[in-house]
Amino acid sequence: MGKKRTKGKSVPEKASSESTEPMCRHLRKGLEQGNLKKALVNVEWNICQDCKTDNKVKDKSEEEAEDPSVWLCLKCGHQGCGRDSQEQHALKHYTTPRSEPHYLVLSLDNWSVWCYKCDEEIKYCSSNRLGQVVDYVRKQAGRITSKPAEKNNGHIELENKKLEKESKNEQEREKSESMAKENIPLDSASQITVKGLSNLGNTCFFNAVMQNLSQTPVLRELLKEVKMSGTIVKIEPPDLALTEPLEVNLEPPGPLTLAMSQFLNEMQENKKRIVTPKELFSQVCKKATRFKGYQQQDSQELLRYLLDGMRAEEHQRVSKGILKAFGNSTEKLDEEVKNKVKDYEKKKAIPSFVDRIFGGELTSTIMCDDCRTVSLVHESFLDLSLPVLDDQSGKKNINDKNVKKTMEEEDKDSEEEKDDSYMKTRSDVPSGTSKHTQKKAKKQAKKQAKNQRRQQKIQERFLHFNEICTTNYTEDNDHEAETALPGEGEVDTEFNRGSQEELTQTELCANQKDVNGQEEMIESAADERKCPEHPEVKSVSTESDLGSLTSAPECPRDLNGAFLEERTSGELDITNGLKNLTLNAAVDPDEISIEILNDSHSPALKVYEVMNEDPETAFCTLANREAFSTDECSIQHCLYQFTRNEKLQDANKLLCEVCTRRQCNGPKANIKGERKHVYTNAKKQMLVSLAPPVLTLHLKRFQQAGFNLRKVNKHIKFPEILDLAPFCTLKCKNVAEESTRVLYSLYGVVEHSGTMRSGHYTAYAKERTASCHLSNLVLHGDIPQDCEMESTKGQWFHISDTHVQAVPITKVLNSQAYLLFYERIL
């Protein structure tokens, strides 16, 4: 009778009208209130029933340390450990064949309801049937406590405290013994603590990253500065006529930054062994809704969204402060004030705390084989995504295959293959396991091909317009312009005032994904003679299959002309730039220079410049790199592949602007004034030109094979001390003069174990004394010297959500690393 009464009940109309969320269709079959009331009499709460029976022979304190989340079946009242545990008894209970399925479970940690059949959370309110059942369970669990429950809970709490004390004392004893062996003084003020993190529902990918960020003490130091109220900063004026800097009063930081600061303080100061990062995770989900829904996600993508979100909040603070400094609201701004604000924002005198800690710079060097002109492209990064070659696939390196393509292939097929291989090799392939991620990969390939076609059409129109401008202007002023190319290795251009024929640019429009994995449409220019008041942010492709530079002569622009800016949405607004082009702007050659910007506003800034660089040293590094060309199973070899020297030839030839001008001015010049573009063979190499204080390396284990994703389980060796010098330019910044070493010490690892469909993220973190040299480098810009290398001793811990265990360094080095965190020591 009880069962019939329960099934006959319907959801009240009031509840259905109040709830805006769609109700689960398995609610009627998965909910049995009568069975629940019987099962919840004299029951031990928050303990897995199956683990309790299976673990009689196991050590009790060991199980207490793991503390898995417990889920209550709403059909029969069974309590089982969740998906984040090793046994997953709650999931096994659901998959057990029965006459009536047990779909619904209730979390005894956060009181959320989950449907295994729908594989999603069910929303409820207190007025409907599900909400009433949850309220009843919460009362029975002791939220509204009865006297016998108080006694029972008090007894359990006493036992837990005893076990906690014993395990804590044992850990401290082991820790002190290991420290005594290594002769490290225990200093509570400078020591970094290691704690467990509660799993909020398939959030191990989040916990593993947070464990490593919590072991970055310089991040906590900078966040303390950011949180200081009434912070006043000074920004140098962009106009040289103005001598006094602009004083900007910054607002309080954004919610994500505040949540991050609060989390780091809890990890350092909280006396509890386990921290629940609920507020920080909710702020991340607000910035990126893809992390909602308790599905397994990718750790590297989480790190990217987290750092980019905090950086965006910092830039917003500065922009609002500049507006307030001009005494204007954001609603009404005249054009003059808007231009001033933009000029100050482009000055970028205040790098965000994210860039100060994790920010580095890559320089792509391209040299024409004919005229030996060297051009440099600077690109900022927060982490490096390194390719992992799979021996089992039996495929050659995709980049090498693209370089060796011949002109005999059809253009359409060649472009499709280049786009496809580009996504496989150097882009950050989404590594989630959900169907959403796979669909996103398909859309990405289609979008890239579409953008490529659109860019070709825009480029053709732009070429046609500029050829008309150049031809008309050349007929009148051809006798006034003269260009001298004195010799190989350098470009020396002579100007006559008022002659603007030689003010040409090389335009590159390429649809690519940058080193940080963010797709963008990039306009790249090599303008040797541009105005310092309007330096343009430019970029060039970082892939060998995009090595064919496409150039166009451009009419000189007025000093007040609009910029063709790099758009984050990938759209190149070329119309506005063409409206402001003029033909008679006189420019003084002495005032023209190339300016290298350190932009922190875009995730991956790229600056293009033509250098009078010595071709013999343009591709040299701080240290020898050839020793890493053979060992394919090491992180050094991955860096070697990432920074290897490439040949741009055949279908990937370079459109050289210098060779094009030389041919136009030579005896074979076209009488009609038409420019015939010259494509030449070239060399290209990407190296680190700014060593970041904290180096983050991402091993691309999740790779795209067609429309599917696969994981490369190959073990990659990584050292405890990494020398980045073989992969740095000779003029690398943040490196002491005449130094041939750039040393980093490993302090954190994110490991992914399992397969694409069923895996788990864990972290290895190093408890150590905070580095003084790293703090001085980040806070004051003091470059570490050779004689000042610090000790790298410390204790390693393996953290799997709430479980923390001390491990030797050998276990860390044998792990299947997915993310590596290195801190600068020299």
Curated annotation (Swiss-Prot):
Q: What is this protein called?
A: Ubiquitin carboxyl-terminal hydrolase 16
The annotated regions of Basic and acidic residues compositional bias extend over 148-180, 392-407, 526-537
User: Which sites bind Zn(2+) 1?
Assistant: C24, H26, C115, C118
Q: Which residues bind Zn(2+) 2?
A: C48, C51, C81, H89
* A Pfam family: UCH
Q: Which CDD domains match?
A: Peptidase_C19K (cd02667)
Basic residues composition-biased segments? 436-456
Per the record, the domain of life is Eukaryota
Q: What does this protein do?
A: Specifically deubiquitinates 'Lys-120' of histone H2A (H2AK119Ub), a specific tag for epigenetic transcriptional repression, thereby acting as a coactivator. Deubiquitination of histone H2A is a prerequisite for subsequent phosphorylation at 'Ser-11' of histone H3 (H3S10ph), and is required for chromosome segregation when cells enter into mitosis. In resting B- and T-lymphocytes, phosphorylation by AURKB leads to enhance its activity, thereby maintaining transcription in resting lymphocytes. Regulates Hox gene expression via histone H2A deubiquitination. Prefers nucleosomal substrates.
Q: Which gene encodes it?
A: Usp16
Q: Where is this cross-link: Glycyl lysine isopeptide (Lys-Gly) (interchain with G-Cter in SUMO2)?
A: K139
